């Protein structure tokens, strides 16, 4: 049993460190060989589910690095499962009531594995403007991991189906069910890697910018990459170099390419992290 405290600080280029929303976070942690539990304001890196960018965009991971609520995890010899609740906002006259339930699991059998990702986002109204939007996204998938037999750092291919169920109870009153296939391939050797994600299907974010009054919910409702608004294809190619990978430090330099079937975009990323360890303020066994 332990209680952890920390401080999350963000500084944008050209801005002073304390001009952005920074927060003190703390959480309770229970740790056993197979089961872990967290409660409080929890860093997202504690999640063990590898949620695709359709669920969490780079921007969400960067600008909202903590979840507020509960995280439960079980890890066995052949797989894992986790469940969490992230309470984003309590209802007021100006703020919506919002919370996210999420889960992920995976089981391995030899070189093959099967798993799922699941989120249910409750996006309600304010005291002055009622209404609720339900946003459910599920991703069952299967994969083949050949890294060990090929003596590679990473070598895998994965195929799955992204299925959404969305209902604006007040303004629509019925579910829309966009979906599509997603295929991923990942290869890494000598700290150089390529990770490609290909999606073909419907617009997974029909209410992001909608042709009706009151339905433009944007990133407040959708946490995934906005490229999934495509009604054609979306391909994300990341080429990266990871020269430093230790328990203390990690450095990754990436060139990320986006193509939505019409236009191409380019993104550059440099991520450097230092793990200072977990200093326990309170400990009970």
Residue locations for each model-derived region?
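Exposed, low-structure sequence patches enriched in small/polar residues
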Residues: 25, 76-88, 94, 100-109, ...
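Short secondary-structure transition/capping segments
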Residues: 50, 93-96
């Amino acid at each position: 049993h332990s209680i952890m405290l920390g401080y999350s600080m963000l500084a944008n280029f050209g801005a002073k460190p304390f001009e952005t929303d920074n927060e003190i976070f703390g959480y309770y942690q229970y740790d056993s060989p197979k089961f872990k539990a967290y409660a409080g304001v929890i860093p997202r890196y504690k999640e063990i589910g590898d949620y695709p960018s359709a669920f969490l965009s780079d921007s969400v991971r960067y600008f909202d690095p903590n979840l507020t609520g509960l995280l439960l995890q079980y890890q066995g010899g052949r797989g894992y499962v986790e469940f969490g609740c992230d309470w984003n906002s309590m209802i007021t006259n100006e703020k919506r009531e919002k919370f996210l339930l999420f889960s992920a699991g995976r089981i391995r059998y030899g070189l093959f594995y099967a798993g799922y990702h699941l989120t249910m986002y409750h996006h309600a109204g304010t005291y002055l403007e009622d209404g609720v939007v339900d946003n459910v996204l599920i991703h069952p998938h299967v994969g083949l991991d050949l890294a060990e037999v090929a003596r590679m750092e990473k070598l895998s291919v994965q195929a799955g189906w992204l299925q959404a169920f969305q209902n604006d109870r007040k303004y629509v009153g019925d579910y829309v069910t966009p979906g599509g296939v997603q295929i991923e391939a990942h290869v890494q050797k000598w700290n150089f890697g390529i990770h490609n994600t290909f999606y073909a299907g419907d617009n997974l974010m029909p209410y992001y910018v909608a042709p009706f009054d009151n339905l433009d919910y944007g990133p407040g409702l959708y946490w995934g990459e906005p490229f999934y608004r495509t009604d054609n294809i979306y391909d994300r190619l990341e080429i990266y170099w990871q020269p430093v990978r230790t328990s203390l430090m990690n450095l990754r330099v990436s060139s990320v390419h986006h193509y939505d079937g019409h236009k191409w975009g380019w993104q550059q990323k440099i991520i450097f992290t230092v793990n200072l360890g977990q200093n326990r303020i309170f400990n009970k066994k």
